[in-house]
Amino acid sequence: MQFRGNVMQENQNQAAEAVENEMTETASAAHTELEQTPEQRIAGLEAEIAELNDTLLRARAELENQRRRAQDEVAAAHKYAIGKFAAELVTVKDYLEMALLDQSGQIDALKMGVDMTLKQLVSAFDKAQIKDIAPKLGDKLDPHQHQAMSAEESDAEPNTVVRVMQKGYLLADRVLRPAMVVVAKAKA
């Protein structure tokens, strides 16, 4: 018990000394401020204001630089976003130009070249997540993916596809071009 009491007494003494030291430092700082003339006090505060203004200006400049860099990165991303797709299309264009330059007159070779070109284009579309919208005959008209170009009397159920005039395309899940279709209407 005696030992515990000594430790507690020592801790209390240390705490009291810490409080006393803090009070002395505070009083000393206050005393120093009191010893300053108003002009010195104003000059000190003006220097502090100038330092804070400088810090603020630097922070604003850094923020503006970050904003500008972010805008530049977004602009570059927009500008070069289709780079891979464009590279794929260049190959397709090369194949088409070679087919046009071919003067051999061999229809089978031309057909094979066009088939290879189509495969290259389909591969480019797959890589770019471009998919066909190719409704089948009898499919219900989907106004999100189909555009009814006309309606014709048919034995088919009304508002179903009876003919596809042109395929549509999706980019991922967004419609690039709706499929152009003719839909059935009830016979009069």
Swiss-Prot record:
InterPro entries (UniProt xref): GrpE, GrpE_coiled_coil, GrpE_head
One Pfam family here: GrpE
Keywords, ordered alphabetically: Chaperone, Cytoplasm, Stress response
Example of a GO MF term: protein-folding chaperone binding
Keyword hit for 4Fe-4S: no
Top-level taxon in the UniProt lineage: Bacteria
GO cellular component: cytosol
Coiled coil: none
Localization per Swiss-Prot or TrEMBL: Cytoplasm
CDD domains: GrpE
Task performed by this protein: Participates actively in the response to hyperosmotic and heat shock by preventing the aggregation of stress-denatured proteins, in association with DnaK and GrpE. It is the nucleotide exchange factor for DnaK and may function as a thermosensor. Unfolded proteins bind initially to DnaJ; upon interaction with the DnaJ-bound protein, DnaK hydrolyzes its bound ATP, resulting in the formation of a stable complex. GrpE releases ADP from DnaK; ATP binding to DnaK triggers the release of the substrate protein, thus completing the reaction cycle.
Binding partners and assembly: Homodimer.
Protein family per UniProt: Belongs to the GrpE family.
HAMAP family (alphabetical): GrpE (MF_01151)
NCBIfam families, sorted: PRK14139.1 (NF010737), PRK14140.1 (NF010738), PRK14150.1 (NF010748)
Entry protein name: Protein GrpE
